[in-house]
C-alpha cells in the first residue's frame, strides 16, 4: 500500500523553508501532495493559480510530488485524495499550539488522519512567506529564501 501524505498550506509564496520540508517528506512517503489552500481570508498576494504554478516549477525536480489547489475542508480533501497523513512544519514553539489544535480537529473529522510534524532545517527555521514578502516590500534582499522562479515572480508583483 502506498503511503500518501499531504503537505497543506497557503504557500504565498512557496519558500525554501517549504521546499526543505517537502523534500524531506518525499524521502518518507511514496507520494506527497503539496496542497495549496485558496485561503481567501488571508488575502494572498498571489492567486491560487499563480501559487500552484510557482510551486509546480519549484518542485519539478521531485518525482513524487503532486501540486494541487484546494478550497475544501482538509479532512474532506485528504479523504478524497486517499491520504491519511498530514505533514506540517513547525518553526517555533509558538507554531505548536495552533498546529496541535488543527491536528485534533482533523483527527475528530477523520480519525485515521495522522499529523506528522517536521522541523525545518536550522537555516530556514525563522522564515515565513509573510516575513519574506515584508522584507521584499522594503527592498530587502530575499534571494536566499526563495526558489529562483518564485523570487522573480515576487519582484514582478512588487513593481
UniProtKB/Swiss-Prot annotation:
**Site annotation (Transition state stabilizer): which residues?**
18
Q: What is its main location?
A: cytoplasm
Record EC number: 2.7.7.3
Q: Which GO terms describe its molecular function?
A: ATP binding; pantetheine-phosphate adenylyltransferase activity
Q: Does Transferase count among this protein's keywords?
A: yes
Q: Which domain of life is it from?
A: Bacteria
GO biological process entries:
coenzyme A biosynthetic process
Q: Which SUPFAM superfamilies match?
A: Nucleotidylyl transferase
- Note one Pfam family from the annotation: CTP_transf_like
The pathway it acts in is:
Cofactor biosynthesis; coenzyme A biosynthesis; CoA from (R)-pantothenate: step 4/5
Q: Which cofactor does it need?
A: Mg(2+)
Annotated substrate binding lies at 10, 42, 74, 88
User: According to its UniProt record, where is this protein located?
Assistant: Cytoplasm
Q: Name one GO cellular component term.
A: cytoplasm
Entry's CDD domains?
PPAT
Question: What role is this protein assigned?
Answer: Reversibly transfers an adenylyl group from ATP to 4'-phosphopantetheine, yielding dephospho-CoA (dPCoA) and pyrophosphate.
The record describes its quaternary structure and partners as: Homohexamer.
Family named by the database record? Belongs to the bacterial CoaD family.
- The name this protein carries in UniProt is Phosphopantetheine adenylyltransferase
Amino acid at each position: 500500500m502506498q503511503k500518501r501524505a499531504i503537505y497543506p498550506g497557503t504557500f504565498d509564496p512557496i519558500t525554501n523553508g517549504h521546499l526543505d520540508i517537502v523534500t524531506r517528506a518525499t524521502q518518507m512517503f511514496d507520494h506527497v501532495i503539496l496542497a495549496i489552500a485558496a485561503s481567501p481570508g488571508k488575502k494572498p498576494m498571489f492567486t491560487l493559480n499563480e501559487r500552484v504554478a510557482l510551486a509546480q516549477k519549484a518542485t519539478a525536480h521531485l518525482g513524487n510530488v503532486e501540486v494541487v489547489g484546494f478550497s475544501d475542508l482538509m479532512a474532506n480533501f485528504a479523504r478524497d485524495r486517499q491520504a491519511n497523513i498530514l505533514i506540517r512544519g513547525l518553526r517555533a514553539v509558538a507554531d505548536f499550539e495552533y498546529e496541535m489544535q488543527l491536528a485534533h480537529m482533523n483527527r475528530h473529522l477523520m480519525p485515521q488522519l495522522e499529523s506528522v510534524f517536521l522541523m525545518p532545517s536550522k537555516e530556514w527555521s525563522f522564515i515565513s512567506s509573510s516575513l519574506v514578502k515584508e522584507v521584499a516590500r522594503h527592498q530587502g534582499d530575499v534571494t536566499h529564501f526563495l526558489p529562483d522562479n518564485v523570487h522573480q515572480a515576487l519582484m514582478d508583483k512588487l513593481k
